[in-house]
Each structure stands twice: as C-alpha cells, then as structure tokens.
Amino acid sequence: MIFNGSIVTSLDKKIKGQVLDFDYEKDFASVYNWLDQKFVDTKLSNLEETPL
C-alpha cells in the first residue's frame, strides 16, 4: 500500500521518486520525480512501491 513518503516507480519506469499526496478514490498521486527533478501528477494505479 502506498502512503505519503513512499518511494515509488511507475510501471513504464519514467517516474521514480517520493509520493507527496495521493487519493485512492480518484486514482491520483502527486510524486516528486527524482529522474527529472520535477513534481508530477499521475495515476496511483500506475505506481509500484520500490525499495531505495
């Protein structure tokens, strides 16, 4: 289960970073993407929890 502060990777590997906000009902997550150093909004279902 993904929470604020969780480290995640997108299924397409374009996002790797830390979750800042999420909503399971809306399938929404706001993530700080370490790969391009930007904040991105994506679908929560597109993310998987990842170890550092």
Regions from the PLM with identified roles:
Residues 1-52:
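Basic/aromatic-rich interaction segments and small domains that mediate binding to polyanionic partners
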